[in-house]
Amino acid sequence: MKLLSCLRTALCLLGLLAMPAAAAYPEKPINMIIAFTAGGSSDVQARIMQKYWNKYAPQPWVFVYKPGAGGIIGFTEIAKARPDGYTIGGLNVPHIILQPLAQNAQFTPDSFKYICQVVNDPQCIAVRKDSPYQSTSEIIAAARKNPGKIRVGLVGPLSGHHLMFLDYGKKYPDAKLTSVFYKGAADQNAALLGGEIFGNINDVMRSIDEFRVLNVAAEKRNGFLPDVPTLREAGIDMVSDIRRCFAAPKGIKPAELDALRVLFKKICEDPEYLADMKKAGQPAEYMDGEAFAAYIAGQQAHAQEALSAAGLLKK
């Protein structure tokens, strides 16, 4: 009997040894969904990250572009993707908060599992270099004289640019600007260069070379534009930023989410990655996935208030 038991144990051990080892995740390329146009801010940042993903991960990314509607098309694709660990994507905040509050979106912030935040990008007011406007205050004064005549480009609707525009409208109801929406920053900037609009609400990175930045909507001056005053310095009490993160569809296996978080953290701590981000004008700021989920929850009240004041809150 004892001999039989030993034989059984030996056979079980042989069976385990014969089993193939579990494949390391990821074992095939990962689809990376970008919800904005190629060449825009989100794409530039993701391309830098891809370079270092290839340094640390065994499989590459396959970029999939789904631009339009302020990111809602791409965000929906991420939320609805099979949660098998092989589709992830870039998300923008406050976009993913605003859109479900104002529309019948097919996602909410709870539709995602957050890998990490990678960028905290303050917004700015930018004009062409030959623009007659030298400050945001001059634009406001001109808008008071000719309400609705000044056209401002936004990536939207229901984007971070749009939220800043709504905050402006609430603060300066007598200085109406007209918003013009674009699919991505590349389209928006081309429109400004072509004279289709008079100014942009934009991010700093996309404005440094081609435009004159009037003011930055941040608590303090931007390191890339140290001579440009903040809106508060100009007497305009507004702060606005866009946070960029990466996420997977809700339902991803915890082990795969953890693996992604480890890989992204390695990238975000890589000195060469940080140097490349700085060179590209991308304000890198890492926040882990759980902390970022808590940050999003804390932004709901502001988003609801802004949409309600503009009559855009979903009935």
PLM-predicted stretches and their roles:
Residues 1-8, 201:
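Positively charged n-region of N-terminal signal peptides that target proteins for export
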Residues 8-18:
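Bacterial N-terminal signal peptides
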Residues 27-29, 170-171, 254-315:
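An extracytoplasmic/periplasmic, membrane-proximal ligand-sensing/linker region
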Residues 23-111, 149, 157-161, 169-199, ...:
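N-terminal (or domain-start) structured segment
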Residues 53, 77-87, 100-187, 241-276:
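Hinge/capping helix and adjacent helix->loop/strand transition within the periplasmic-binding protein
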Residues 24-25, 139, 234:
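A short beta-strand-turn-helix
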Residues 37-39, 93-94, 128-133, 155-159, ...:
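Short coil/turn segments
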Residues 203-269, 298-301, 315:
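C-terminal lobe and pocket-closing loops
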